[in-house]
Amino acid sequence: MTNSLPLDEIICQLQESWQNLPDQRKANNNKQYEVSDAALSAYSVFFMQSSSFLAHQRDIHKRKGKENVSTLFGVKKIPGDNQIRNLLDPIKPDHFHADFKWVHKKLAENGCLATFLDYQNTYLVALDGVNFHSSEKIHCDNCSHRQDRAGTTHYYHNAIIPVLVKPDSQHVISLCPEFIVPQDGHEKQDCERAAVKRWLLQHHGDYQPHQVTFLGDDLYANNPLCKLIEESYEQFFVFVCKPTSHTTLYEQLASSTKIETRQERYWNGRYGEIWSYRFVNKLPLRSGDDALLVNWLELT
């Protein structure tokens, strides 16, 4: 059994899968570029050591007589940056979800996915928002926006990028992203928490029969979201919980007589450390009768 998944095998799968991507252009005989070639060209950017897609291809062609994208990714005719955007922007991200699941299926078959199980036989999924576009001028209908104190409007694109992680490893496995974009029928702007809820709705059962422990910062330590994870989807979470945003919890903590402590010695590879733990169970995440009771842990 091997834990590798060759790039050639992935590219072959993507070539086949992306032949079925929707083409928003009107039917005619003068189409210069295929949507699948645009998708493969965009995918190839992740493997380049150049800030310019076309400049890199021209340099390779000049030195070796054949473009890198054609050789490695099987692109028949290489579109430029603008053509790639025009062809791919109208395509909904959902069309690419099956490709993520194909990769995960292959990683499960070759044993790689099993190496990410923790000591409780659950997967660890880190949740985080990523900003991948910001401008005061360039914007589209899918942009979020905010105004600063000077009244300047800032436009930006964010997405939730969940990844499968494991302790003491620098490697992660990317999961399907969820983009933070205006939602039909909603007047308020989209946000990270709403995007995470949509992601959970679609993907919470992807790794059954194994359960998932979700990891995240203070933003996710929110009563409705935590209840959704624990009660509706029967999964686990470990979220940062700051005193400034969880005053009720820390007031209860300050008056608690049930705080337990523990110390352990740990060798970090260079010198010894003493890890000090403080923990207590069943503290309310917020005020109110419907507050979720959570376990609190501090490590210093």
Which residues does each PLM region occupy?
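Gly/serine-rich nucleotide phosphate-binding loop at the start of the catalytic core
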Residues: 1-79
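Contiguous, well-ordered alpha-helical segments that form the cores/surfaces of helical PPI scaffolds
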Residues: 39-44, 163, 198, 224
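Short, conserved catalytic/metal-binding motifs centered on acidic residues
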Residues: 41, 56, 80, 84, ...
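Active-site-proximal, Lys/Arg-enriched surface segment
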Residues: 85-169
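Electropositive, glycine- and tryptophan-enriched low-complexity nucleic-acid-binding patches
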Residues: 147-211
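Domain-level cores of phosphate- or acyl-group-handling catalytic modules
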Residues: 187-248
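An anionic, glycine-rich sequence signature occurring as long contiguous blocks
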Residues: 240-300
